């Protein structure tokens, strides 16, 4: 009986969201230069053609100095009529004919906490927040692979609670970085909509990469990067076919380059991505250079090569400081590597991949057994098996980056220091 009541409550909560709120799926994404700008994404019913965004600093308690800008929505049917699941487990087809808004706001103050809200003639959203960059010192949460799925809300809750654990470890955070697979099926718009109602999406700028699950439909047919693209408002500075999916931005002294592994499966796709990365690095000098993709660098269970040999030579050439990934659901971090060998800190790229964080889809391996491959490269591995939850805290200063792996209870499992590479 208790289970039935819980399901009914979930259905009532999630089913009412679109009907009661004319403004949905609000999220802040980085602009190319996060010192002065931010990208805000939201959607409305197609009957609403324009909306205002009102923003000001958090110190402006009465919104007296708020700026207001009007943006027009663009009709979006990317997710319409796709097969999906409701919170009660019932099958349905998404009915998503919306106007989508990608708002770039600029002229912001650096290193400042802002608040914002969306306003239509019918509705005013809750207040959301983001922080601009500008300080050499900042902190973020890194998380991935929580596979948000309407019938199993505990997946989302596990990940959001884990972000809370990182907040307790070091508060305040400046933003959140995800490494893909934050939805079970990216083609199910209701999954994104429900996810964006969570508190961490209200409180932070989020940047992320397209995971294979974010790229797929429930039927695994008609998969496309448009699901990821239209769920946020990432910078349109990628390459052909990847605008708003592959992108780069700067936060403080760090250049982040975000890749889409789904379009790098072929050698041709890989070459296009690598040529773009070369151009981005050449045109955007930075103390730290971080490349992110979803697929793992090594297979965590045995250490076997995965994406590492596809990228390591280019990373060596470009002086990439840190390479981040997810997908394998087993944490692994390496020593600094260059030319396939372990080198001194500041002389090579550090590779790290995250675990899953949904307490359900983790991967098991015997950590007591000696690792079979690349044991000299990989310094630490960790997993809890199927029910794994973890995230990383990232602290950046002018001298180094420190990445700390935390378990669900806030216990420190691994600390990796990453230093700028001097070419």
Give the location of each predicted region:
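Acidic, histidine-bearing metal-coordination/catalytic regions of metal-dependent phosphoesterases
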Residues: 19-148, 393-423
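Acidic/histidine-rich helix-loop elements
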Residues: 59-96, 140-160, 220, 230-237, ...
């Amino acid at each position: 009986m208790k289970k039935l009541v819980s399901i009914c409550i979930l259905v009532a909560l999630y089913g009412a969201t679109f009907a009661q709120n004319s403004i949905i799926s609000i999220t802040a994404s980085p602009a190319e230069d996060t010192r002065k700008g931010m990208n805000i994404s939201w959607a409305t019913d197609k009957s609403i053609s324009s909306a205002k965004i009102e923003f000001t600093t958090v110190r402006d308690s009465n919104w007296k100095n708020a700026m207001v800008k009007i943006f027009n929505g663009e009709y979006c049917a990317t997710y319409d009529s796709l097969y999906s699941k409701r919170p009660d487990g019932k099958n349905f087809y998404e009915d998503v004919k919306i106007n989508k808004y990608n708002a770039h706001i600029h002229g912001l103050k650096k290193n400042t906490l802002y608040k914002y809200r969306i306003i239509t003639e019918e509705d005013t959203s809750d207040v959301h927040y983001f922080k601009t960059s500008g300080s050499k010192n900042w902190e973020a949460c890194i998380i991935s692979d929580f596979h948000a799925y309407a019938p199993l809300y505990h997946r989302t809750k596990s990940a959001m609670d884990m972000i809370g654990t990182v907040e307790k470890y070091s508060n305040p955070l400046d933003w959140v970085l995800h490494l893909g697979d934050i939805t079970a099926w990216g083609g199910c718009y209701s999954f994104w909509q429900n996810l964006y109602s969570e508190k961490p999406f209200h409180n932070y700028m989020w940047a992320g990469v397209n995971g294979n699950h974010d790229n797929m439909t429930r039927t695994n047919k008609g998969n496309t990067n448009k699901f990821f693209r239209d769920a946020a408002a990432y910078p349109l500075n990628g390459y052909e076919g990847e605008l708003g999916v592959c992108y780069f931005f700067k936060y403080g002294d760090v250049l982040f380059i975000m890749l889409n592994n789904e379009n790098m499966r072929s050698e041709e796709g890989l070459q296009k991505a690598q040529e773009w990365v070369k151009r981005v690095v050449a045109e955007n000098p930075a103390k730290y250079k971080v490349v992110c993709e979803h697929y793992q660098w090594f297979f965590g269970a045995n250490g076997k090569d995965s994406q590492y040999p596809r990228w390591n030579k280019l990373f060596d050439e470009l002086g990439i400081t840190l390479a981040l990934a997810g997908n394998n659901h087993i944490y692994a971090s390496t020593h600094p590597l260059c030319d396939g060998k372990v080198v001194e800190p500041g002389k090579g790229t550090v590779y790290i991949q995250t675990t899953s964080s949904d307490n359900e889809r983790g991967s098991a391996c015997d950590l007591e057994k000696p690792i079979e491959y690349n044991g000299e490269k990989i310094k630490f591995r960790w997993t809890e098996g199927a029910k794994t939850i973890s995230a990383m805290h990232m602290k950046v200063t002018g001298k180094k980056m420190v990445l700390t792996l935390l378990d669900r209870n806030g216990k420190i499992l691994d600390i990796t220091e990453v230093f700028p590479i001097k070419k």
